[in-house]
Structures are given as structure tokens and as C-alpha cells.
Amino acid sequence: MTKYKYLRLGLKKRIRYLKHNRRNKDYIVFLHGFMSDLEGKKPKTFLNFAKKNDLGFLALEYSGHGKSSGKFINGNISKWTKETSLFIKKNVKTNRIILIGSSMGAWISLNQFKFFKKQIKGFLGIGSAPEFLENLMWKKFSRKIKLEIIK
């Protein structure tokens, strides 16, 4: 059975996560995709891989995803990137990191290079969907909204 934990960020915010602690070892940090969570096969597969290979493991549900607090509509890539960097800093400390990002999680993983450049040992993007923002959102925006965003 997978045991999930919660990290409090502020008075009302809780982030659900999975962690396999390994001091002085490299950590796999798995970042899920858009509107996803930690219930799928990918995070559990990478957790099992980490355990079998004596690696640390960390995965979180961004705010508004899964059982983490918050509303999905109040989130965005910048917010989830910041949450992720704070979360990694608090949990991984100075250990080296292997980032694995699925779909939007690959984008958020790439953003982590700004914060952990010297700690990142590797990166794997799975179905990184570089066009997902265009297909999911941009094409649905009115001309007025598009012009406002471009300003």
C-alpha cells in the first residue's frame, strides 16, 4: 500500500506527496502532468525503481491537483513551478536530483534548472507535449483575451 503524506504550506494549503527517504543518495523527483495526480502507474513505477536501486524518491501533487488543497483554476505553471521548487528544497536538501516530468511535469521540471542547476544530475521528459498550452487554451481564447495576453 502506498503511504501518502501532506506538507503544510501556510495555514490552509496542504500538498500531498510520496517520499522514499535516502540520505546521501541521489533522488528521483517525479512531476506529474496537467490535471493528474499520484494515483497513476508512473509515480508508483518510479517509486518502486528507486527502492530497488537504493535511490531517494519524491513526488508531489501541485495545488488544485489530486488531494492537495486549492482550486485547479487558481493555478498556473508559474505557481506550480514555485511550489515544486520550495517542496524540493525542503525535502531533498543538497542531494543530487534526477528529474522525471510527465507532460506538463516536463515543463515544470525544466523550470527547476533555474533553482537547482548544480544539483540536477539528469532529466527525463515523458510526452512533454510542447504544444499543450496552444491546443488546450490558446485556440479557445477570444481575440480580445489573446491581445491582452500579448501586451
Could you tell me what each predicted segment is?
Residues 1-23:
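N-terminal cap/lid segment of alpha/beta-hydrolase-fold proteins
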